[in-house]
Amino acid sequence: LVSLQGLGDRYPHQLSGGQQQRVAIARALVCKPRLMLLDEPFSNIDTQVRMKLILEIRTLLKRQGIGAIFVSHSKEEAFAFADRLALFRAGHIEQVGEPEQLYRQPQNRFVAEFLGGVNYLAAEVVDSHCVQTALEVICGHEPHGRARGERLQLMLRPQQLALAAAADGDLLVREQQFLGHHCRVLVECAGQMLEASIGEPLEGERARVTVAPHALVLFEQMS
């Protein structure tokens, strides 16, 4: 059930961290619980082993029809394990929902910044779907519920900025970091630094940007 065949004669210190966690899960399953509490169960396990083990245990619990409350300080672990997230701050729940919902539509700046990189752009509402920013007019695919002329801040994830090298582009490429599965790019727009996450490094010192329509996330301006 937990892929530990042939290890029954070993002592605990002879097992890896991942194997010890599988033993703990197996012992808990003997009682046929309806709900399990997992409190930071993977904190001392190597990163690559940790993510593999999280997916294994998630699959196992679903196959057995067992619910789980999983406590973690790692957003990567939470995204990999959870069907629903509850994000706490100082003992209070900030937001509850599906992982993608919290990431794409955070209710406040704390949730937005805790779950990933963010850019904030000054924005003025031009109609029910669009705002004017220093980049361009950016439109959402659903009404944002704000009044025309209202001045706010638009949140954009680095992945939402699509960059293309262009000699006459409005953006200055200030820094690029190749990180394997993506490239982190810092660009300057009207004196403001923005972070983008793209597939391949850019060539040249200037770029253009486009922002695909999405559900706009607008916050009040910082006082």
PLM segments and residue spans:
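ABC ATPase nucleotide-binding domains
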Residues: 1-108
